[in-house]
């Protein structure tokens, strides 16, 4: 195949949905460092944290917590970008999703993150409410 001068090969584009799935798969496999690097390169991924926490695979959700342990050390000024996404999933119907979001908020630990956790003190699920009480008591 002949390519004329000036003609450029267009890179294959990946949809956000596909990229979110790849992130979840990498987190499940324990490749958190790769995802840390992605977050460092593009801050829009913080908007996807809530979606990642809805994944049924426990290893993915655990990976999100580990991800934020890294990010709080390497990019402390950026972690609050996840707050809107995390606040959104606090209204999720599934208690474990709300609990996971609260756990990530506690890792972030900023005054704004803790204020969001405070709003969940009366969660209808007793386990979620207990997690909130434990976090606030440790503050």
Describe each PLM feature range.
Residues 2-17, 40-54, 76-89, 110-122:
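Amphipathic alpha-helical scaffolding segments comprising HEAT/armadillo-like alpha-solenoid repeats
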Residues 56-57, 93-94, 124-125:
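Short inter-helical turns and helix N-cap capping residues of alpha-solenoid HEAT/ARM repeat scaffolds
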Residues 115-139:
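Short, Lys/Arg-rich amphipathic alpha-helical interaction segments
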Residues 2-7, 20-41, 59-76, 96-110, ...:
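Structural detector for internal amphipathic alpha-helices that build alpha-solenoid repeat scaffolds
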Residues 88-95, 128-129:
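Short, mixed-charge aromatic SLiMs
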